Amino acid sequence: GVSPLEMASAYGTLANGGTYIEPTIFTTISSYDGQLIVKNTPEEHRVVDPEVAYVLTDMLQAVVTEGTGGRAALSNGIPVAGKTGTTNKSLDAWFVGYTPYYVGATYLGDDAGRKDSNGNTISRKGISGGSSSAAKLWSTVMNKIHKNLTKTDFKVPKNIYFTKINLIDGGRSSSGSNAAFIKGTGPSRYSSRPSRPSQSEEDTNQNQQNTTPETPTTPETPTTPET
């Protein structure tokens, strides 16, 4: 399996503009009189281009502002990018997210379960609220950490531009949602569809969301957590 630390480290790569930084539990060790004994310099290397990392960050912000990760939003308005994840019957619930300051991962699950006479796990208890509960736990912790920090946005690389698109078919639309693109990769055609789904489409999507829980995905080693 994948640990919360590994997930936080992967998402940390996105938060750091595409650079992976090895997680560490300390930065320096000093003597009682302030002399430096050990300086812990973590390994770091570029994994993806800054522009690619930002486009993913832009997408993941939408998970919090208008998707399944709404409960991860911070009370002071500092932007959050992240993703929820659940397994079948909500036996496991995740939220991994980051801000311009920190990255963190929350996991909720019944690791003990009900066992038979031989000690084998035969059933596990589902998580009430699923990934929404994991997102809420994330914001509860992060609200305290970000309490006195200044609101700031994620840094936008120079080769990124924004245009409005129709979320249904991906075409350009003056009444659509703003989305980030790398220069030269944005949509050239205009959408011929309404920017919002019809009521019947919304009902269908809602039914699908209620019956098919999302599956957590492991990002391609995308912020290195600050500890």
Placement of each model-derived feature along the sequence:
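A penicillin-recognizing enzyme superfamily signal
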Residues: 1-192
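Proline/serine/threonine-rich low-complexity "mucin-like" segments in extracytoplasmic/periplasmic regions
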Residues: 178-227
